[in-house]
A protein has these predicted regions:
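Alpha-helical transmembrane segments
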Residues: 1-16
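A contiguous, well-structured "functional interface" segment within a domain
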Residues: 15, 35, 72
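Active-site-flanking beta-strand signature of metal-NTP-handling nucleotidyl enzymes
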Residues: 18-24, 188-190
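Mid-to-C-terminal secondary-structure elements
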Residues: 42, 46-204
Length: 204
C-alpha cells in the first residue's frame, strides 16, 4: 500500500502551477456597499489586464478554491429519475487546460464573458454513477431544482473528463460534476506559468 501511494500520480498537472491570493477581499459580506463592489470590479479588471500582459503566464483562473480544496455536493437525477450524489466543482474551460485534465468524450465549449450560460461536464466516475456509458442522451438535474419545478428538464452533459484524485489518495476518486461557465470570481488565482520562469513571474 505505501509503495502504491508513493507511485500513484494524482491525475492532473502539478508542475509550474502557482496558487496565490491576489484580491484580498473582506469575508464580511455585510460590510459590502455598492461603491465597494464597483471598486472591487475595477481592481479585478486591472488585475486581469496585468495577468494577460505577463509573458510568463500560460493560463490562469480566479476562484474561491483550488483543485484540492474540499468540495461540497448534492443529489442529481438521471434520465430515469434515479438519485445520485455528486461532488460539485465550479470551473471555467481554462481550468481543464490549466491542469492538463484530459477530455475523453465530447467537447468543452469556449464560453466568453458575454455568454452567461453554464454547461455540465462530469468525470468518468460520475458518468458511471449516473448509469450512463456515453454522453449521448445523458442529462442531469439537481434534485432540489426538480422538486421546485416538476416540469424542469434535464440539462445535457456536454463532456466527460478523466478522473483525478481531489484529495488524499486513500479517499479514492470522487464522482464529480463541473458546472462550467465563463468566469467565477474569487480571491484565489490558479496560475500555470512557463517552466523555469517562476522568479520572473513573481518579479513581474
Amino acid at each position: 500500500q505505501p509503495g502504491m501511494l508513493l507511485n500513484t500520480e494524482p491525475g492532473f498537472r502539478t508542475k509550474n502551477i502557482m496558487n496565490v491570493n491576489l484580491v484580498y477581499e473582506s469575508k464580511d459580506f455585510s460590510s459590502y456597499t455598492y461603491e465597494s463592489m464597483q471598486q472591487r470590479r475595477q481592481r479585478v479588471m486591472q488585475l486581469d489586464n496585468e495577468l494577460n500582459a505577463c509573458p510568463f503566464i500560460e493560463l490562469y483562473e480566479p476562484s474561491n478554491e483550488n483543485i484540492l480544496t474540499p468540495t461540497f455536493g448534492t443529489n442529481y437525477l438521471n434520465n430515469k429519475g434515479e438519485k445520485v450524489f455528486l461532488n460539485i466543482h465550479y470551473a471555467t474551460p481554462a481550468f481543464f487546460k490549466l491542469y492538463d485534465i484530459k477530455v475523453i468524450e465530447g467537447e468543452i465549449p469556449d464560453i466568453n464573458k458575454e455568454n452567461r450560460r453554464t454547461v455540465f461536464v462530469v468525470n468518468k466516475a460520475a458518468l458511471k454513477a449516473l448509469g450512463y456509458t456515453s454522453i449521448n442522451g445523458a442529462g442531469v438535474i439537481e434534485e432540489n431544482q426538480k422538486r421546485a419545478n416538476a416540469n424542469a428538464s434535464l440539462q445535457p452533459i456536454v463532456a466527460v473528463v478523466e478522473d483525478y484524485f481531489e484529495g488524499h489518495l486513500t479517499s479514492g476518486i470522487k464522482p464529480t460534476i463541473y458546472p462550467v461557465g465563463a468566469r467565477f470570481s474569487g480571491d484565489l488565482y490558479q496560475i500555470a506559468y512557463t517552466p523555469g520562469k517562476k522568479k520572473e513571474l513573481i518579479d513581474f
